Amino acid sequence: MNFETVIGLEVHVELNTNSKIFSPTSAHFGNDQNANTNVIDWSFPGVLPVLNKGVVDAGIKAALALNMDLHKKMHFDRKNYFYPDNPKAYQISQFDEPIGYNGWIEIELEDGTTKKIGIERAHLEEDAGKNTHGTDGYSYVDLNRQGVPLIEIVSEADMRSPEEAYAYLTALKEVIQYAGISDVKMEEGSMRVDANISLRPYGQEKFGTKTELKNLNSFSNVRKGLEYEVQRQAEILRSGGQIRQETRRYDEANKTTILMRVKEGAADYRYFPEPDLPLFEISDEWIEEMRTELPEFPKERRARYVSDLGLSDYDASQLTANKVTSDFFEKAVALGGDAKQVSNWLQGEVAQFLNAEGKTLEQIELTPENLVEMITIIEDGTISSKIAKKVFVHLAKNGGGAREYVEKAGMVQISDPAILIPIIHQVFADNEAAVADFKSGKRNADKAFTGFLMKATKGQANPQVALKLLAQELAKLKEN
């Protein structure tokens, strides 16, 4: 029997506000344990939450970017549960009326076709703290993350393969990043994914029993975990067994999923309206203000790069996959850089350097200004493409002007015939045996002089000019 895969994804995205959702404490990642906390985060008696307007701004932008309807009458709810990283014993979230609902996003499949994936809801909530279980037998609680604003985006169960799930996450990450509401860095926990997967016989409308997957710390692991689950569940069903509703985690080392717990029923969180936060309304004017702040999104940028800048579909897709790279490219082209040359450098030498150094484009000293200047001095013959690679490394590590560095470092190409011709004559004088071979008609004897000339100029001779002049002087030599 053949089965159809049914996948839905729940994605938590940390919003990049300066402060937390209900307290004025910094929401910055990476500070010392419990440094970003105050009495609200610790849930001291009598303290009250105050909603951060920037969080609602981000929620509106997310809903608009994901083609969602908005609930204009906003309220929050209490989700009741006890855990050490949740000192209030409840989480402030949204239950029956999320900020956004009934949305969709378009994904591109491997065969070049597109598909719309429905988005059921997007709701705002606060994050919990972090538990760490030490080897000393103690458990430690860090509440820096407590109260960091989240938006949870819940897809419809519209994906039919792990590849579609991967494409959905890629598209979602791009949209969220371009909207400017999160850096969506999975390695820092600002984007977290849970997957729900079930199988059903082809033609059956009713969903099968779903399994929830956790510990998916990269898009690649989401795909691998889902691929394993497809195989595991199919084997159980084909052998006459039944799938249990359970939560499993992905084991990256063994590329399998491991049982965490069996779900015997839906958790009862006893939601009720949050009494400490008043109801409020999102006005049409507020929505339109947020709409005007949304940028051009990846799909539109890709189309423009192809139609207006003459880039290939591949180049346009690579450049727009990351907003930082795309914005860098935009600035470089606006400064007069040739679009194809800027694209080639960003996808070639720049990408290789970043991978080797383990850094991002924001973490190096290269700027659109000095990259364009470097491309300009390649095009005008000041330096060769070979020398440019060395210049780029210097700019990436130290910044500064490309032309200034080249001149100080003595890397300027020699293109003046008045300088090159005497050097060529000296090369002839210093290599009499090679001259004799050339005059006698020995095959390929002329090629040796290219190496002699480049050595004599320490590689600074402009290859095009030098080869032309060398051919000219060799012709004269043969006549004599």
Curated annotation (Swiss-Prot):
One of its GO terms (biological process) is glutaminyl-tRNAGln biosynthesis via transamidation. Pfam families: GatB_N (PF02934), GatB_Yqey (PF02637). The keyword Protein biosynthesis applies. Belongs to the GatB/GatE family. GatB subfamily. PANTHER family: GLUTAMYL-TRNA GLN AMIDOTRANSFERASE SUBUNIT B MITOCHONDRIAL AND PROKARYOTIC PET112-RELATED, GLUTAMYL-TRNA(GLN) AMIDOTRANSFERASE SUBUNIT B, MITOCHONDRIAL. Allows the formation of correctly charged Asn-tRNA(Asn) or Gln-tRNA(Gln) through the transamidation of misacylated Asp-tRNA(Asn) or Glu-tRNA(Gln) in organisms which lack either or both of asparaginyl-tRNA or glutaminyl-tRNA synthetases. The reaction takes place in the presence of glutamine and ATP through an activated phospho-Asp-tRNA(Asn) or phospho-Glu-tRNA(Gln). This is Aspartyl/glutamyl-tRNA(Asn/Gln) amidotransferase subunit B. It comes from Streptococcus pneumoniae (strain 70585).
